[in-house]
Amino acid sequence: MREKRLWNEDWLFCAEALPARAFSVKGPMYKQAKTERVRSGPAARMHNDAVDDYRDGAEYSPERWEAVSLPHDFVIEGVPEARGNNARGFFAYGDGWYRKHFTLPPSDAGRRITLYFEGVATWATVYLNGCLLKRNFCGYTPFEVDITDLVEFGADNVLAVHVETGESEGWWYDGGGIYRNVYLVKTDRVAVDLYGVYVAPQKAGEDLWRVPIEITLRNDGYAACEAEAQVSLVDEEGAIAAVASATGSLPARGKATLLCEAQVRAPRLWDVDAPHLYRAAVSVYVAGELRDQYETRFGFRTFYADPQKGLFLNGKRVKIKGVCAHADFGLSGKAVPDNILRWKIRRIREMGANGYRTSHYPHAEATMDALDEMGFIVMDETRWFESSEDGLEQLRTLVRRDRNRPSVLFWSTSNEEDLHVSPIGRNIHRAMAAEIRKLDDTRLITAAISVRPDRATLGGDLDAIGVNYNFPLWDPIHEKWPQTPVFISECCATGTTRGWYWPDSAEHAYLSAYDRDTNESFLGREKTWKAVMARPWLLGAYQWIAFEHRGEAVWPRLCSQSGAIDLFMQNKDAFYQNQSHWTSAPMVHILPHWNHAGREGETIAVWVYTNCEEVELWLNGRSLGKRQIERFGHGEWQVAYAPGELTAVGYAGGMERVRETVRTSGPAAALKLVAEDTRATANGQDIAVFTCLAVDAEGREVPDASATVTFFASPLGRIVGAGSDISQHKRLSDPVVRMRAGRAAVAIRLGREHGTLRVMARADGWQSAQCALEI
C-alpha cells in the first residue's frame, strides 16, 4: 500500500562548494567512472559529515555542517550589501550541499521507493550512495527521483543534494536551497503514476454531469499483469456521489492508461463564493488483491469567456479581481512552510481578491490547495518559454500536477517575452500549446504580453489574450482580435511605502503612500480598476502585486514597493483601496494617520477609500463636508492640521453604514504584541508570526513611532525573521529591529514540543510586551 511521508527533518547542510578530489591516476578514475561514480566529497557515501577526509588530510571544523530542517533557504542567511545584485535582493549567492542519512526496513524490499521534491533553488543534482540519480534545472518545478534500484534495506543510506544558485531564473529574489517540501513515497510495484489520475467533469444536462476519468498505472515489475481501478467520487461530507471502474493490461516495466466514466446528478458546484470540492478515491487491484490507493481533488464548474461580454462561471458573469504574487515570504525568504502559504492566500482573500496569477512559475502545492479551497480564479504559469525537451517537460509537469484543480482557468506559456512579436515566439508558443492540449483541453491557453501586444505574432493563437500594462493599447487589441477574449494579466505596479505620506525619499528609497499613475501605460490602482470595469468585454485583471517581495529594488530599499501588503505582512493603504474596489461590505479607510506634530495649520491631503456612495469627514466634531464618491474613486479633502480626531462616515441609501476614526496619539510609551492567525502547529516546520505595535500611555497605536526593538522567544521556537524597515540591512534572523512607522513583525519557527510559546519585545525607555500562544 502507498505510504507518503513528509521528509523535512534530519538534514545536514554545508554552505560550501566542496569539490571532490580531481584524480590524475587510473585507479581512482576507473572507480569513479562506474555507477557509484562519486567516491570522495560530500556526495560520497562514506564522506564524514564533520571531517574533510579527501582534501590532503585537512579537517573541516564540525560547524561547517549544520543540522537543518526543511524548508530551507541558505541565501537569506546572509546580509544584503550594496554591491549585490539589486534584482536578486542584494544577497551573495553560492553553492550548498545537503546530506541525509536514512535506513529503510527489509520489509520495504520489493516496493517502489521514490523521493518527491516540491522545489529546489536553483540547479539540483541528486545522489544516493555516491550514484548520480537526477539533475534538475528549474527551481520551481517539482521532480521525482526513483531510488528503488539503489537503496539498501536495513542499512545506512546517504542521500546528497548539490544546489547551485549561480544561474538566476528571474529578476527577483531566487533564494537557494531545498526550499519546499520533500516526501518519501513507498508504493507497490503496481501503482498509480505520479499525477496519474485526471478527472474532467462535463455538464451533460440540467443537473447531470459526465465525469470522464483517466487513471495512468505503472508496473515496475518484470511480468505483465491485469489490473483493475475502482473509483469513488466523494463529496465534502464523505458521501459517495458516484462510482466507476476500469480494467486493463499493464506491460512489464511499463505504463497504461485506463479510462472510465461516472455520472453525477446535481453536484455542489465549485465557485468563487462557494468553492465546493470533491475527491476521486482510486483503488488498484491485481488478481483481486488491493495494491494501491490514491486520491485527488476536483470540482464541478463550467466557465466560458465571451470576447464581448466577459467571463462567465457557472453561467454567472464574474470579473477577475486578481493579484499576481511571488513565492517568497518577507520573514523567512524562499523557505515558506505550508501554514504561511495558506495564511498569505487568506490575507488576499480578506482584501477582496478572487484571482491569483502564479507569477512567473509554478507555485507550491499548499498554495494551489488554498486557492482551490478559497475560490480563486488562477492563471497558472510555467517558468520557461521554451520548446526544448526540458522546457516542454517542465510544462507537462505543471499541467499534470494542476489539471484537476477547479481554480485553474488559464494555462500561461510565458511572460513579457521579446519573442512575442517574432515568428520564433509564435513557433514556441504553438509547440507549448500543443503539449498542453494533449494533457488538458478544458482550459484557456494564454500568455502575458508586454512588448507591443497589439503586434504579437501569437495573438491569433491564444484562447485569451493577456496584456501586461499598456493601457493605451487595450481598446486597439480588442478591435484587432474581436473574437478573442482579452484580460489584463498584469497592471498597476504602483510603488508605495507603508506609513510614508511625504514626497518620495531618495535617501531611504521610500515612496509616497498615495495612489498615483507611473505613466500612461502604468496606471494607478484607481484608474486601472475604473478602466477595467468600464469595459465589459475585459475578463478582469491581475494587479501587480499582492505582497512586497525581495529584489527588483533600489538601494537602500531591499524590496519592490508595488505590494498591497508590505514585506513584513503589514497592510498598506493600498490593501484598503483594493477592498474599496473589490468588496461589498461597507468600509472606509482614512489616510494619512493623524500624528503630525510641528505641522499645525499646514494643509494635509486627506484621502478616504470607501465602497459607500457618500463620505462625510469630521475633524474634532466639526464637519469638513460630505462628498459623493465616484464608484471605484476616493474622497479627498485638503485639511488644515490640528491634533485630535479625524472621522470618516460612509453613507449608502442615505443611511450611515460605517465609520472609521484616526486619532492623534501621545508619545510612544510601550510595546504591544499581537499573534497573527497563522494557525501554526508544533510540527517542526510551521511559523508563528507576531506583530509588534508601539502604543502610548492610553494604549493607542502610535503610527509614526520609531525605536530599536529586540525580540525574544521561548525554547519552543526560534526566531527566523524579524523586520520593519525595508531599508534596514541586517541578517533576517537577527532579533534586533529598527521599528519604522510604529510596527514591526517577528517570525518564530516552531519545534515539535507542545506547550506555551512565549514571545517578548523590548525597547529602551518603553514598557516591554509579552504574548503567549498555545501550540
What are the functions of these language-model segments?
Residues 147-149, 260-269, 637-641, 733-752:
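Short, hydrophobic beta-strand segments
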Residues 3-24, 45-59, 75, 168, ...:
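Substrate-binding clefts and catalytic carboxylate motifs of secreted carbohydrate-active enzymes
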Residues 5, 12-18, 73, 77, ...:
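Accessory beta-strand-rich segments of carbohydrate-active enzymes
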Residues 52-57, 64, 69-104, 108-137, ...:
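Active-site-adjacent substrate/metal-binding segments within catalytic domains
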Residues 213-217, 283, 604-609, 649, ...:
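Beta-strand-rich structural segments
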Residues 225-230, 272-279, 611, 618-622, ...:
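Short flexible loop/turn segments that cap and initiate beta-strands
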Residues 152-154, 216-306, 634-636, 640-644, ...:
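Extended acidic/polar, glycine-enriched regions
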